[in-house]
Amino acid sequence: MVLCFPLLLLLLVLWGPVCLLHAWPKHLTRAHWFEIQHIQPSPLQCNRAMSGINNYTQHCKHQNTFLHDSFQNVAAVCDLLSIICKNRQHNCHQSSKPVNMTDCRLTSGKYPQCRYSTAAQYKFFIVACDPPQKSDPPYKLVPVHLDSIL
């Protein structure tokens, strides 16, 4: 029993930061957090665009993709045929056409001085969708996770 406690403590220390990286601010719905992280109708330089996201989480996010489209258009993808997500769930949907997007990758810095590379892309995307929460827009399904870029 004594040997188990240090091992448990080590696991908690190692897994704690991983869990924090995937959490979203609890005062936001998952759809609203998706919109903040991934919807940017007009292209912005990544250092500027990422500062808003990093201010919520208080750390430098390693990678992020901004879709240059409206939330309404991205939410419409949720009405397309369901496909299997990376996590094996069946709530993902692929865009029917490519969209302009910006890929931001952390190159240096420590919060709040995060520095990113900026790469313009024109690709398809896959989003995970869930039923809306009370304060979400009134769609049948809303995007909650950017699962992949194709």
From Swiss-Prot:
Residues annotated as catalytic: H38, H145
Location in the cell: Secreted; Lysosome; Cytoplasmic granule
Enzyme Commission numbers on file: 3.1.27.-
Leader sequence residues: 1-23
Record-marked site positions (Facilitates cleavage of polynucleotide substrates): H59
Binding-site residues, substrate: K61, H62, Q63, N64, T65, K86, R105
Annotated site residues (Critical for catalytic activity) in this chain: K61
Disulphide-bridged cysteine pairs: C46-C104, C60-C114, C78-C129, C85-C92
InterPro entries, per the entry: RNaseA (IPR001427), RNaseA-like_dom_sf (IPR036816), RNaseA_AS (IPR023411), RNaseA_domain (IPR023412)
Glycosites: N55, N100
Any one Gene Ontology cellular component term annotated for this protein: extracellular space
Protein name: Ribonuclease K6
